[in-house]
Design a protein with these regions (language model features):
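Domain-level signature for proteins that mediate thiol-based redox and metal-cofactor handling
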Residues: 1-119
Length: 119
């Protein structure tokens, strides 16, 4: 894990909201064909708000750490707020520089959440 920011390493080793939800309204799987990362997102809604979220799957340091940080951020947000998020939002939430070649890893979780909410 040499070369990664300490914040990314910490979140990848002990990710927040990792695991499955027993009761969920939405389950969405998404793979990153570029590198082989894959994520499964479980979401429980309360009206138009994301009440609870969990994830599992396999991924690199960047994708797991981003899933951890973004999952904490989106909990309690409305569908509209989440759907309005973009790569700039993601960069602010993560708070560390993500090189362009790893941006697809970093946004895997957010893409899965948004696709799940829109399906």
């Amino acid at each position: 894990m040499q070369g990664y920011d300490e914040k990314l390493i910490a979140h990848s080793k002990k990710p927040l909201n990792h695991g499955r939800l027993r009761k969920y309204d939405i389950l969405y799987n998404l793979d990153n064909e570029t590198c082989g990362d894959g994520i499964r997102v479980y979401m429980r809604m309360k009206g138009d708000r994301l009440d609870e979220i969990r994830f599992d799957g396999k991924g690199c340091v960047v994708s797991v750490a981003a899933a951890s940080m973004v999952s904490r951020y989106v909990k309690g947000k409305t569908v509209k707020e989440i759907m309005g998020m973009d790569d700039e939002s993601l960069k602010r939430i993560i708070g560390v520089k993500i090189v362009r070649s790893r941006l697809r890893c970093a946004n895997l979780f957010l893409r899965a959440v948004k696709k799940g909410l829109s399906s």
